[in-house]
Swiss-Prot record:
Pfam families: TolA_bind_tri (PF16331), TPR_21 (PF09976). GO terms for cellular component: outer membrane-bounded periplasmic space. Keywords: Cell cycle, Cell division, Coiled coil, Periplasm, Repeat, Signal, TPR repeat. It comes from the Bacteria. This is Cell division coordinator CpoB. Mediates coordination of peptidoglycan synthesis and outer membrane constriction during cell division. It is found in: Periplasm. It comes from Pseudomonas putida (strain ATCC 47054 / DSM 6125 / CFBP 8728 / NCIMB 11950 / KT2440).
Amino acid sequence: MRMCRRVVTVLALSLPLAAWAEVPVVDDNAGSYPPAGYGTSGAYAGSGASAPASAQGQLFMQLQQMQDQLSRQQGIIEELQNDVSRMKQENLERYQDLDRRINSGAAPAATPDNSSGGGASNAAPDAAAGAAAQQPAGSSQPGDPAKEKLYYDAAFDLIKQKDFDKASQAFNAFLRKYPNSQYAGNAQYWLGEVNLAKGDLQGASQAFAQVSQKYPKHSKVPDSLYKLADVERRMGHTDKVKGILQQVVTQYPGTSAAQLAQRDLQKL
């Protein structure tokens, strides 16, 4: 009887242990360290553990936007640098062209056609015929050739000195004082050259245009028209350039200005 009680007692005590052993152990964090919700230090981070990743994404986007802005600004700077380089090159070419014209025999003229400068003129007529051709309609006031030449030479010397501001003023004053001078056509042309050297494209355009308008028979007309086309191109008036160049080629064949105009037409 006593033995039966012991067996029953052992069985009663072993049943909970057997049931506990049958319950499977599930590890939700198997294979991961640290466990979810905990930082690397072991401290619990809570549900906001994903916040640092979001902040890093925003920072990356901001940096990307800044990089894009810097790239655009760099492109603008490069364009401006190219424009400045082009303008410097054009100014240098204008000065060099002016020097060539001065040094190639384009000195102050003893007659209206001795100062052809660009080589675009044909054989020069005599001084009397040239002076008559330059006089606008209705003008018959006599001049003083010696005094006119003195004023003209003084203005031209300012070009040689590269004092373009004073040269422009001097040629303007000469044309106001001696509009019918035998040197007026030359003065009008060189006024255009001086204004171009100064970078005054509007003034250069007006001066070159007036050579053919006021002195249509003057030997400077082909050169002045060709230079006018160049100025209009610089000002962006491409619609006018082709017509002016065609006028030079058609009306003044055989001149160096016509040859240059033909070359430029082929590039348009």
